[in-house]
Regions:
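Phosphate-end processing signature that detects enzymes handling 5′-triphosphorylated RNA
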Residues: 1-166
Length: 166
């Protein structure tokens, strides 16, 4: 498990500079038999190819999570995805484009949602909770509102319930 400290902002547009990478992301969530939400995510970019990641997050405090993450094979990802469509499973789905911008030792991840929302959210993972973010020029003019720790803006909350009643 690793500690993840991040800040999240609603932005009015994508930055007007060229990103370092762009990913197509699809995420599936389901609540396991212990009542814990699990996530499987697939990333695809021309630079990095395909990646499949399984994650369980536990909220520690506002903007701070413990994260248990490991890589999946495509077959394991497909099995997870298929489980989300089984009868009686509480499951959710979201898809988005992620635009990645390096900023010194940090990186901004700007997500443009495809799943029915006209919403763009920027996140930055920081080394500690007291870290003073210096907004780079490309982010200064587009940030509208900080939403760190507001549950309604978590990816899982923004995801769409899978209708798996067969």
């Amino acid at each position: 498990m690793k500690l993840e400290i991040e800040r999240k902002f609603i932005v009015k547009s994508l930055p007007k500079v060229k990103p370092d990478d762009i990913y197509e992301i699809e995420q599936f969530y389901f609540k396991n038999d212990k009542g814990i939400w699990e996530r499987a995510r697939t990333y695809h970019s021309e630079k990095s190819g395909n990646m499949y990641i399984h994650t369980i997050k536990k909220t520690v405090s506002k903007g701070v999570n413990m994260e248990d993450e490991h890589e999946l094979t495509k077959e394991q990802f497909d099995n997870f995805k298929n489980k989300c469509f089984q009868k009686g499973i509480e499951a959710r789905h979201i898809s988005k484009e992620r635009w990645v911008y390096k900023d010194g030792n940090l990186k901004w991840e700007v997500d443009k949602f495809k799943s029915g929302y006209h919403l763009i959210v920027a996140e930055i993972e920081i080394p500690n909770k007291r870290y003073d973010i210096k907004f780079p020029k490309f982010m200064e003019d587009i940030i509208l509102l900080e939403v760190t720790g507001i549950k309604q803006f978590s990816n899982r909350s923004l995801s769409i319930k899978i209708d798996n009643i067969l």
